[in-house]
Design a protein with these regions (language model features):
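Loop-to-helix element that buttresses phosphate recognition and phosphoryl-transfer chemistry
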Residues: 272, 293-318, 334-347
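A structural signal for short hydrophobic beta-strand segments in well-ordered beta-sheet cores
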Residues: 144-148
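A short core secondary-structure module
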Residues: 143, 155-206
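Alpha-helix capping/hinge segments and adjacent helical runs
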Residues: 22, 57, 69, 327-411
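Glycine-rich phosphate/pyrophosphate-binding beta-alpha loops
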Residues: 135-136, 164-169, 389-396
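A short, Trp-centered hydrophobic/proline-enriched beta-strand micro-motif
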Residues: 122-130
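Internal helix-loop-helix
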Residues: 46-123, 168-174, 302, 316-324, ...
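Glycine-rich beta->alpha junctions and the first turn(s) of the following alpha-helix
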Residues: 3-5, 204-305, 390, 406
Length: 411
């Protein structure tokens, strides 16, 4: 395992830093400062991702054959670390990080030619159709029906049912979706993986309110209803009934990632808040030994996680697969995210309590009262509530513990 960067790696890091300093302009920085979930609205995301694409850096994990930069795992880690350290928005993962690898591995030549170029350019927005009202962690129980039919338009599936917790479905042009094409086989064997145009007749998207409040431009989750929605058979990825295999492959990309640098950036913000807040005795909160101990413990968790990430990426560079370790990264990373958001609210104290007041006032038809406290505190409560879901999406952390126990510990 090599934890020290080579001279070439350090030169690459400087190149990335110089580009970020120019491309991540004050307007984007201000938008990110008020983001409750770490992403921009659609217009902001598209603008950022097209800037990355213009530099050739929109898809660091893609092979060169499909338009990727051809980086080593270490370069990819450096790139993601520098973006996180600068507070840049991550790319929306649904297209570039999730469905694209599935299309590359299991799609036909025609599907690759049709879907991959617009994904790379961020010309087409994707959402994920996995969870259902009665199928979350037990995803194999999904029931969205896809009945095969043939008429003058050729062979197609007719979809009836719904998906839920569908992130940014209101923005999406396309959805990658798990559907049930058979009820006779084992649950996992009756699932297929299809791509569907969100403009198809019969699709209805309904926004779901969440605890973090109605922040303009930051609506996240939706329920999507399908009423006799026709999906051409040629939009199925791979073989019928093999969707579960493709979904498991995709989840490796959803669960894995670079958490350490992002957590360190969040902790630096917490320290800045604490340095600005007086404690009960009039001293700055950062001077309080108890608070500093909590902050130090989280710094150690972030540093430990980053060391694990570097070890895993070093293995990837030697030809090893991350495999079930992606569950470990997801578990440790999301729990640390939640703990940091809790400490940020604690640091800001009463200033963190009012949130999205202007929006609530507008909904209620009244004038907004002045917000108490510094500007940075306005987003702390929405972010705290938003991060409660981090231990659930992508497979709940309870499921991740089961995977770790079975595949890594042999229990």
């Amino acid at each position: 395992m090599h934890l020290e960067f080579s001279e070439q790696d350090l030169q690459f890091r400087n190149e990335v830093r110089a580009w970020i300093a120019e491309a991540f302009d004050p307007e984007l920085r201000a938008m990110m400062a008020q983001s409750k979930n770490g992403y921009l609205d659609k217009a902001g995301q598209v603008r950022w991702q097209k800037a990355l694409h213009a530099r050739g850096w929109a898809a660091p994990n893609w092979p060169e054959a499909y338009g990727g930069p051809g980086w080593t795992p270490t370069q990819r880690h450096i790139f993601q670390s520098e973006l996180a350290a600068a507070g840049c928005p991550p790319v929306s993962p649904m297209g570039l990080k999730m469905v694209a690898p599935v299309i590359m591995k299991y799609g036909t030549a025609a599907q690759k030619a049709r879907f991959l170029p617009p994904i790379l350019k961020s010309d087409v927005w994707w959402c994920q159709g996995y969870s259902e009202p009665n199928s979350g962690s037990d995803l194999a129980s999904l029931q969205l029906r896809a009945d095969l039919a043939t008429d003058g338009d050729g062979a197609h599936y007719v979809l009836n049912g719904s998906k839920i917790w569908t992130t940014h479905a209101q923005w999406a042009d396309w959805m990658f979706c798990l559907v049930r094409t058979s009820r006779d086989a084992r649950r996992q064997e009756g699932i297929s993986f299809v791509l569907l145009d969100m403009r198809t007749p019969g699709i209805t998207v309904v926004a779901l309110p969440t605890l973090d409040g109605p922040v303009p431009g930051q609506q996240e989750v939706n329920q999507v209803f399908f009423d006799n929605v026709r999906v051409p058979v040629e939009n199925r990825i791979g073989e019928e009934g093999m969707g579960w295999t493709y979904a498991k492959y995709l989840l490796e990309f959803e669960r894995g990632g670079t958490y350490g640098p992002t957590l360190s950036k969040q902790l630096a913000k917490v320290a800045a808040i604490a340095a600005d807040q007086p404690g009960d005795d009039g001293r700055r909160l950062l001077e309080d030994a108890g608070f500093r101990r909590k902050l130090a413990q989280l710094h150690l968790r972030a540093a430990g996680l980053q060391a694990v990430e570097l070890k895993l990426f070093s293995g990837v560079e030697s030809g090893k697969s991350i495999g079930a370790a992606s569950s470990m990264l997801k578990l440790l990373g999301t729990e640390a995210m939640q703990a940091i958001s809790e400490l940020a609210v604690e640091a800001a104290g009463p200033a963190a309590l009012p949130f999205v007041q202007d929006t609530w006032a507008e909904i209620q038809g009244r004038e907004a009262s002045p917000r108490v406290g510094p500007d940075y505190a306005a987003v702390l409560a929405p972010r705290y509530f938003n991060y409660r879901k981090a231990s659930i999406y992508g497979g709940s952390n309870e499921i991740q513990r089961n995977i770790i126990a079975k595949l890594m510990l042999g229990l």
